[in-house]
Amino acid sequence: HGKKPSAEFKKVHALVQKSHDECVKKVRIGMTGIEGDKLCRHIIEKAGYGKYFIHPTGHSLGMKIHEGPYISQIEKEKLKENNVFTIEPGIYLPDKFGVRIEDTVVLTKSGAKILTK
């Protein structure tokens, strides 16, 4: 609320951004939702914040705002060409702050294309 971001906030924000960018760069047709989720989650876990990433990495969009295949730790369905889904890793530190970075992507033969700005 008008304060400069703390060093911890900057660190967490950069980590979430790195996690997001890695998933956008590496997600591919034929991966399961589990594999897509791991692209984000392993970066956050490796940095020691895994227990603060408390939601799935993303969800598909269609007739409903949240639908499968999900980009989650339990989604076995494979991603297909032209699937539209979110990539939205986040870290939530209790009584401090939370950071989530979200984009909607379409999965093409060459990878994820960001649709949001």
Go through each PLM region and give its residues:
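Active-site neighborhoods and metal-handling regions in enzymes and metal-associated proteins
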Residues: H1-K117
